[in-house]
Amino acid sequence: MNDWNPILYEKFLKERTLPAKDLLSRIDIASPQKIIDIGCGPGNSTKVLFDKFPNAKIIGIDNSKKMIEQAKNNFSKIEFINADISTDEINYENEFDIVFSNACMQWIPNHHVLLKKLMNMLKQNGILAVQIPINFSEPIHKLIQKVTTSDKWKNKFSVKREMYNLSQNEYCDILAELSSDFFMWETTYYHVMPSHSSLLDWYKGTGLSPYLNQLSEPDVNFFLQEIFEGLTEIYPKQKNGQILFKFPRLFFVAKK
């Protein structure tokens, strides 16, 4: 298995897009001319921006070729670029009115450097808007950590999944150095999932992908079965058989 799977990602598109809409609702800027969406995935967050600002020039970038291909298929009127924001291939300066990033930064190291780069991409008085998952202390992530570091599986993974989130206090310190006008908040979403299988599918499209990419097909099936069995133990069914999936996220908006 290679790259991200847009089809799996889009299976829960409504739930994944809601934080982008919530982030956009806190951006106070009139008639932006140019916007960039960092880590646009299959274009769902970029479409949210396009619907709000149809007259702006909007660019979506993502380091996944499959995600960019899907985004181009989904939204032909928007420009999408396959590129990695953490490298020098993306080197805009003073160019955008809005730099937007929804559920992407957790995959990118060196947030001190990254946030400075994103702010440098903004025009004066431009807005940086970011949402980052902060659910890594939730039961599902503890389960993934337990399984992937077990004697049975640890030697299968030469590359470990890493999340590069900083603490809220660290983000506050960084933003204070970059902006005199910023605010932060958290929102916890409670997604009602139809079943444990649907919860597994959610993570097959995101958090489990770095592990699945390293396994042979037979191993993929055994690995997913072990994760599934763990999910049935840590997420009890509601009375109607559904699963309540808690997902906290951190947001911040900063003006240049």
Each model region followed by its residue ranges:
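Short glycine-centered segments of the SAM/dcSAM-binding site in methyltransferase folds
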Residues: 34, 126-127
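Class I SAM-dependent methyltransferase SAM/SAH-binding core
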Residues: 34-89, 113
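Conserved catalytic/acceptor-binding region of the Class I
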Residues: 112, 119, 127-194
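Conserved class I S-adenosyl-L-methionine
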Residues: 1-33, 44-48, 67-70, 74
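Conserved Class I S-adenosyl-L-methionine
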Residues: 42-44, 160-256
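Helix-to-beta-strand junctions that scaffold the AdoMet/dcAdoMet cofactor pocket
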Residues: 108-109, 122-124
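A short acidic, Gly/Pro-enriched loop at the edge of an enzyme's catalytic core
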Residues: 90-99
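A short SAM/SAH-binding and catalytic strip from SAM-dependent methyltransferases
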Residues: 98-111, 134
